[in-house]
């Protein structure tokens, strides 16, 4: 009996403008998967849209239809076998012709297709495969015209996008270009087999004492005939077989077995334990011959969202294996506009950065796509929790019957595809669609529980989020929590801070509050918040070609910042807080300081609130990454170069973090006067699961001289509350009559004799401070073939020492505050002897 054979159709393709009938219209495609812009660039028909104003010169592609074709030779077909043509992803309106005959019409980018082409390929020899990709941009506009009664309320992009099941950011977003891709964006192949394992998944039941786990493995088998098959299941850990069992495949194509695992090794998010992965495999056997084999890795763990009434309202936090997890992390957008260009290695580097930054959760945002398997594999292996949105974003989606059916198929396919990943702990119905409902005044009666009524309102999309999607998750991944939207909380106003999750945009957007009070603006789980910053100069040098354009307000820089009102917002936060500059390099740095400070103030306070009966369950900043070289809210740019905010967040998310802050008086109000006194607070946050003892030292250091202006405070043998907050000082007082000199509050904490964390509180705003002549010393103290260690010291307090980010180089820490009497070490990996030292910059330099 022949085993399943795969024949990828990745080479030999050509493509053309569908309307171009000339003989020389066809152009070669280097490799499939691809999208049309990649292929046009490869043929020198399109400039790089990521550079300068080139995006505008590529817009013509958005309004074209494209045809791809190839020929292939029919593979040998053993007796009793069939040939299938499999598409893992077609973007988006695709008509597939085999030897001139239409065999598939697809209108959903997020679906895979498998077609039995045995009869169509009866003839030996070469066969033609042609795919027409109709213009999604124009089709969307036509679909919108056909339903004039629907309220097409939306944020970002053309509202017609709501009619098409395609990545919504392709229509342009407030951080990305308008690039309407089309093409074979995931693998296409031929498969020859008599039978195959169509799906393999597990149900994990973990005993409450974690001493035993029952693993039930399920296989779904597809066969081209009625032959009987056996399914041989194997369970293993780190390559060592733990169990094996063989069963007959039932007439309906199903097979299942159960394994008992004693003293299982659990899957944990990083920082809490090992991300242990078991492997289950199933071999499909006929007459002792293996015809197909599939393996999947999975984790033994429990995960839940805890929502309980408390003094703050109703909690919203994650609990894994019985341990409450403060979910500090980021939101994720697609890593490129050309999705096929994102390799497994590139995905892994992004997730490695998450771990390096001590971030424990990543939110896959609903305007992008259900990511490649390699993305989730990396999260599984490295212990990063995934908050997974369904692909609906910022709009009131129509609910035509054919569209609802497509959405149901899409959600079933993707939940089934991803359900074995232990990293995925929540499925969420949409991004900000309930905010669109509020903004547009659409009907939403939470007390009306009749789904058929929802379809009759001007907010019919509720039917998707509160009926279709929860039903799919319940059927195919019942152990995974489902949340109707982000933000959403029990049908209340999406800005309600007492319930559910919230997107807090009153820093930057909205009322543009001071970032120093960010922590007072949060809710039970802050799943979006952000502050823009320019990327590093090396990234700007990539997309700004002309030196004459390298000034802060240049047209090309404005063009690469898609956020509405970005200039006045950046200007406001700069002018309120810092001494501004007109040269681009300093301007870039100053925006990065503001972003780093904003993230620090938010995260630091919200993590502290975790210890107050889980007042804040987590914080996911907007956003981790970029889809092109740009100016945005990302804390790591398109080229994986971290901005200073990345390091600021990492320090606050240290397993033990110490915090100090004084009361900051608003200096921008009428008749603002210097305060006579300020209160200050001191605390320790810990994610450790056991109590430890520590020593905490607080010093008061003059910014002008570096000397201590008052007696230091030392707390010895402090019992640090596990997985919570230890408040040491809640009513400290600074009397500026007694200590008028501007000074910082510098705190350190030692555990078991090791210095584990620092924090420095500065007078606000920085623009009032003289930060010249700091006496900074950056000394190389050790060097090996691939690593350097720097020793940092200063005679006076230094604010935000930022190192140059260089390709292939990883820095242990940056955006560092340095105070006298506290030397710090920074490790730099990827630096070789003889390499030029990393440049650096600090405030007031």
Curated annotation (Swiss-Prot):
Catalysis performed (reactions): Hydrolysis of terminal, non-reducing beta-D-mannose residues in beta-D-mannosides
Pfam families linked: Glyco_hydro_2 (PF00703), Glyco_hydro_2_N2 (PF22666), Mannosidase_ig (PF17786)
Keyword Secreted found: no
Gene Ontology MF, one: beta-mannosidase activity
Keyword field contains Glycoprotein: yes
Entry keywords, A to Z: Carbohydrate metabolism, Glycoprotein, Glycosidase, Hydrolase, Polysaccharide degradation
Pathway: Glycan metabolism; N-glycan degradation
Active-site annotation: 432 (proton donor)
Glycosylation sites: 717, 723
Top-rank EC class of the record's enzyme: hydrolase
SUPFAM superfamilies reported for this sequence: (Trans)glycosidases, beta-Galactosidase/glucuronidase domain, Galactose-binding domain-like
Gene3D superfamilies: Galactose-binding domain-like, Glycosidases, Immunoglobulins
Enzyme Commission number(s) of this protein: 3.2.1.25
One GO-annotated biological process of the protein: polysaccharide catabolic process
Top-level division of the source organism's lineage: Eukaryota
Function: Exoglycosidase that cleaves the single beta-linked mannose residue from the non-reducing end of beta-mannosidic oligosaccharides of various complexity and length. Prefers mannobiose over mannotriose and has no activity against polymeric mannan. Is also severely restricted by galactosyl substitutions at the +1 subsite.
Family as reported in the entry's similarity comment: Belongs to the glycosyl hydrolase 2 family. Beta-mannosidase B subfamily.
Additional free-text comment from the UniProt record: In contrast to clade A beta-mannosidases, which are likely secreted, clade B proteins appear to be intracellular.
PANTHER family recorded: BETA-MANNOSIDASE (PTHR43730:SF1)
Name of the protein described by the UniProt record: Beta-mannosidase B
The species this protein was found in: Aspergillus clavatus (strain ATCC 1007 / CBS 513.65 / DSM 816 / NCTC 3887 / NRRL 1 / QM 1276 / 107)
The gene coding this protein: mndB
């Amino acid at each position: 009996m022949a085993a399943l054979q795969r024949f990828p159709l990745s080479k030999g393709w050509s493509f053309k403008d569908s309307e171009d009938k000339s003989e020389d219209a066809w152009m070669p495609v280097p490799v499939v998967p691809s999208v049309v812009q990649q292929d046009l660039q490869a043929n020198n028909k399109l400039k790089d849209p990521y550079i300068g104003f080139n995006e505008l010169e590529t817009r013509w592609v958005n309004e074209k239809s494209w045809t791809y074709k190839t020929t292939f030779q029919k593979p040998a077909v053993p007796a009793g076998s069939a040939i299938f043509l499999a598409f893992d992803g077609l973007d988006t309106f695709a008509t597939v012709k085999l030897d001139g005959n239409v065999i598939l019409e697809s209108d959903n980018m997020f679906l895979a297709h498998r077609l039995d082409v045995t009869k169509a390929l009866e003839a030996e020899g070469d066969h033609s495969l042609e795919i027409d990709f109709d213009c999604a941009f124009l089709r969307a506009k036509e679909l919108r015209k056909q339903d004039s009664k629907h309220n097409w309320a939306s944020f970002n992009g053309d509202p017609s996008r709501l009619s098409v099941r395609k990545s919504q950011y392709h229509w342009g977003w407030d951080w990305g270009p308008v690039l309407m891709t089309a093409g074979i964006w995931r693998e296409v192949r031929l498969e020859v087999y008599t039978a195959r394992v169509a799906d393999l998944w597990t149900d994990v039941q973990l005993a409450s004492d974690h001493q035993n786990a029952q693993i039930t493995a399920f296989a779904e088998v597809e066969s081209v005939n009625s032959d009987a098959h056996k399914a041989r299941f194997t369970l293993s850990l780190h390559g060592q077989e733990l169990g094996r069992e063989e069963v007959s495949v039932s007439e309906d194509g199903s097979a299942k077995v159960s394994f008992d695992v004693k003293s299982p090794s659990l899957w944990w998010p990083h920082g809490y334990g090992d991300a242990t992965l078991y492997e289950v495999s199933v071999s499909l056997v006929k007459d002792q011959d293996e015809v197909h084999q599939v393996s999947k890795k999975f984790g033994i763990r429990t995960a839940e969202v805890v929502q309980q009434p408390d003094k703050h309202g109703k909690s919203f936090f994650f609990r894994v294996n019985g341990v409450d997890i403060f979910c500090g992390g980021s939101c994720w957008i697609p890593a490129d506009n050309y999705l096929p260009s994102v390799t497994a290695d590139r995905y892994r580097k992004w997730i490695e950065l998450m771990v390096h930054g001590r971030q424990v959760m990543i939110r896959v945002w609903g305007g992008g796509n259900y990511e490649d398997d390699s993305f989730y594999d990396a999260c599984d292996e490295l212990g990063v929790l995934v908050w997974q949105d369904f692909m609906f974003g910022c709009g009131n989606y129509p609910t035509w019957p054919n569209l609802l059916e497509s959405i149901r198929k899409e959600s079933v396919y993707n939940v089934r595809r991803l359900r074995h990943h232990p990293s995925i702990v929540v499925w969420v119905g949409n991004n900000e669609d309930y905010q669109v409902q509020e903004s547009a005044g659409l009907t939403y009666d939470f007390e009306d529980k009749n789904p058929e009524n929802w379809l009759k309102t001007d907010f019919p999309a509720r039917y998707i989020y509160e009926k279709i999607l929860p039903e799919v998750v319940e059927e195919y991944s019942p152990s995974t929590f489902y949340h109707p939207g982000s933000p959403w909380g029990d049908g209340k106003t999406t800005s309600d801070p007492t319930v559910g999750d919230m997107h807090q945009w009153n820093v930057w957007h909205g009322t543009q509050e001071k970032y120093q009070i960010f922590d007072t603006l949060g809710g039970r789980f802050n799943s979006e918040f952000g502050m823009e910053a320019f990327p590093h100069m090396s990234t700007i040098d990539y997309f700004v070609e002309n030196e004459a354009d390298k000034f802060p307000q240049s047209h090309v820089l404005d063009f690469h910042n898609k956020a509405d009102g970005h200039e006045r917002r950046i200007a406001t936060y700069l002018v309120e807080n810092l001494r501004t500059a007109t040269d681009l390099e300093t301007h870039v740095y100053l925006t990065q300081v503001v972003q780093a400070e904003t993230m620090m103030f938010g995260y630091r306070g919200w993590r502290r609130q975790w210890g107050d009966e889980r007042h804040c369950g987590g914080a996911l900043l907007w956003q981790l990454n970029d889809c092109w070289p740009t100016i945005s809210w990302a804390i790591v740019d398109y080229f994986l170069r971290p901005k200073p905010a990345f390091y600021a967040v990492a320090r606050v998310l240290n397993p033990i973090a110490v915090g100090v802050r004084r009361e900051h008086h608003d200096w921008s109000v009428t008749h603002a006067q210097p305060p006579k006194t300020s209160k200050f607070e001191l605390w320790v946050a810990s994610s450790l699961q056991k109590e430890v003892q520590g020593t905490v030292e607080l010093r008061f250091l003059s910014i002008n001289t570096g000397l201590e202006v008052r007696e230091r405070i030392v707390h010895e043998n402090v019992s640090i509350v596990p997985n919570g907050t230890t408040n040491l000082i809640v009513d400290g007082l600074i009397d500026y009559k007694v200590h008028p000199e501007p000074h910082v509050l510098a705190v350190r904490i030692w555990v078991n004799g090791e210095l584990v964390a620092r924090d420095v509180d500065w007078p606000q705003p920085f623009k009032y401070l003289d930060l010249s002549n700091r006496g900074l010393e950056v000394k190389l103290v050790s060097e090996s073939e691939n690593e350097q260690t720097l020793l940092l010291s200063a005679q006076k307090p230094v604010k935000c020492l930022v190192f140059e980010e260089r390709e292939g180089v990883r820095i242990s820490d940056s955006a560092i505050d340095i105070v006298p009497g506290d030397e710090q070490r920074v490790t730099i990996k990827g630096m070789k002897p003889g390499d030029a030292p990393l440049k650096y910059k600090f405030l007031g330099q």
